[in-house]
């Protein structure tokens, strides 16, 4: 019930942004309501000196003395989700330019955003979302307009901050390659309610019996293997949060470049029950690429066709669906 409420709240916030485009941020922003698409009334604070130092090192064009922190560090959602008005799921960006555009053009259908998006000029002033990339085959980031002249970005697992439109350029995000505005097609509230109902039905909660079955399978793994895996996992998770190449990344695939991932992958299929056990905690959804890299049976992997409503679920629900599939079909 709690998750359904969160989803509906998310829809309500993004519906306001897409349909009414009203100012819902701080009155201190003196924002133009016609330009503001802030997804929710957000907290604002001044970054600490340590945060300023880190951000300045990794984003040299960022004026850290003129930014605000609008959201604390969390791995629950990323920049792509936030730019679509979603804060309860992580949505990996499509790497290829055209596929990335399709994500936004079909944001309502694919992810449950309250509206789809249309392309607009990257040079104009009417854009509400910018898509970033280092090239047409490496799309990396999404930022959203916050107020007149100010933009907002969720930086991977890290903070959500305000910034001038192009201040994150010449970094791992590359530069702005495409811009969007909310689709002018009116959103029917009845459609939103129906979509919310559909997503609630798709939401997975593993039963106690399923969880125990996973725990039992993991308990059968050799202690030395388990210790090695846990040590590598903890080291990997820590590295993700401090390495600039992963700390700010909106794609869980970026985490696969770290040496700990390679070491865990080399441990082979024996660690799959341990991966499943970790996935019982939905915050560990970023383990999915490791499972996909190790699992050789395609029937035990979750994949989607374009337009599949299950894409709505995000990485967290996909992780739970993967656990359930593995339990139902695995002979291990």
Which residues make up each language-model segment?
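Post-signal peptide N-terminal segment of mature Sec-exported envelope proteins
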Residues: 27-44
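Bacterial signal peptide processing site
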Residues: 19-22
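Sec-dependent signal peptide recognition
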Residues: 2-8
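C-terminal motif of bacterial Sec signal peptides marking the signal peptidase cleavage site
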Residues: 14-17
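Cysteine-nucleophile protease catalytic domains, especially the papain-like/related folds used
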Residues: 54-108
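Extended repeat-based scaffolds of very large eukaryotic assembly and lipid-transport proteins
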Residues: 188-332
């Amino acid at each position: 019930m709690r998750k359904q409420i969160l989803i509906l709240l998310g829809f309500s916030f993004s519906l306001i942004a897409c349909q009414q485009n009203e100012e819902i941020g701080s009155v201190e922003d003196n924002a133009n309501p016609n330009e503001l698409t802030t997804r929710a009334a957000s907290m604002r604070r001044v970054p600490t000196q340590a945060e300023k130092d880190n951000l300045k090192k990794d984003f040299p064009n960022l004026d850290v003395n003129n930014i605000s922190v609008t959201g604390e560090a969390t791995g629950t959602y990323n920049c792509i989700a936030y730019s679509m008005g979603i804060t309860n799921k992580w949505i990996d960006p499509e790497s290829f330019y055209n596929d990335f555009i399709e994500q936004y053009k079909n944001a309502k259908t694919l992810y449950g955003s309250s509206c789809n998006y249309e392309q607009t000029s990257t040079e104009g002033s009417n854009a509400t979302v910018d898509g970033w990339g280092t090239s047409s085959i490496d799309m990396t980031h999404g930022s959203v307009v916050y107020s007149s002249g100010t933009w907002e970005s969720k930086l991977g697992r890290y903070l959500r901050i305000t910034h001038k439109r192009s201040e994150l350029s010449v970094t791992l995000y590359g530069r702005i390659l495409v811009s969007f505005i909310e689709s002018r097609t009116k959103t029917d509230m009845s459609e939103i309610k129906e979509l919310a109902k559909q997503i609630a039905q798709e939401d997975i909660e593993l039963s106690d019996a399923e969880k125990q079955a996973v725990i039992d399978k993991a308990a059968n793994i050799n202690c030395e293997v388990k210790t090695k895996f846990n040590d590598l996992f903890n080291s990997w998770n820590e590295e993700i949060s401090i390495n600039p190449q992963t700390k700010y990344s909106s794609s869980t695939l970026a985490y696969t470049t770290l040496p700990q991932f390679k070491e865990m992958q080399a441990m082979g299929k024996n660690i799959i029950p341990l991966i499943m056990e970790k996935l019982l905690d939905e915050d560990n959804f970023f383990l999915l690429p490791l499972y996909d890299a190790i699992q050789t049976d395609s029937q035990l992997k979750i994949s989607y066709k374009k337009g599949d409503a299950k894409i709505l679920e995000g990485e967290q629900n996909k992780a739970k669906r993967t656990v359930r599939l593995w339990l139902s079909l695995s002979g291990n």
